[in-house]
Amino acid sequence: MAEKNERPIKVIAENRKARFNYAIEDTLEAGIALTGTEVKSIRNGKSTIAESYADPKDGEIWLINANIPEYLQANRFNHEPKRPRKLLLHRKQINKLMGAVERQGMTLVPLKMYFNERGRVKLQLALAKGKQLHDKRDTEKKRDWSREKGRIMRARG
């Protein structure tokens, strides 16, 4: 039997501020409906999801404000860089997310965009609640203290 050529997961874009600005409750993987020029542009590695979010609309979940720049060789057949993109999820997942967003005041935040083993573009989506300023300060203090503990332990040896 022929062996499969296993490709590792390749991260394309990451939202580093999301874990600082939001308290993450749950994560899940979603596919994205893309055009051919968008996939080619993503393969060039220039896309960003730092200021993007997901929004439920008409029984579907849409990725808003994600920047996938135009593919240079596509000329007139190019896509719009910040167009809303449909996220591909199961109906049960969509209903769960829509309920959490509407009833509990939570937000859908993309954490990272990556190619899976099969070469498909996937989005790791988080169901999160926004942090207040004092919560962010607490997070920063804890992180600084853990760094300081590491330094002290290395110094003592």
UniProtKB/Swiss-Prot annotation:
Q: What is its main location?
A: cytoplasm
Q: Which GO MF terms are attached to this record?
A: RNA binding
Q: Write out the annotated subcellular location.
A: Cytoplasm
Q: Which domain of life is it from?
A: Bacteria
SUPFAM superfamilies reported for this sequence: Small protein B (SmpB) (SSF74982)
Q: Which UniProt keywords apply?
A: Cytoplasm, RNA-binding
What this chain does, per the entry, is described as: Required for rescue of stalled ribosomes mediated by trans-translation. Binds to transfer-messenger RNA (tmRNA), required for stable association of tmRNA with ribosomes. tmRNA and SmpB together mimic tRNA shape, replacing the anticodon stem-loop with SmpB. tmRNA is encoded by the ssrA gene; the 2 termini fold to resemble tRNA(Ala) and it encodes a 'tag peptide', a short internal open reading frame. During trans-translation Ala-aminoacylated tmRNA acts like a tRNA, entering the A-site of stalled ribosomes, displacing the stalled mRNA.
Question: What's the name of the protein?
Answer: SsrA-binding protein
Its taxonomic path starts at:
Bacteria, Pseudomonadati, Pseudomonadota, Alphaproteobacteria, Hyphomicrobiales
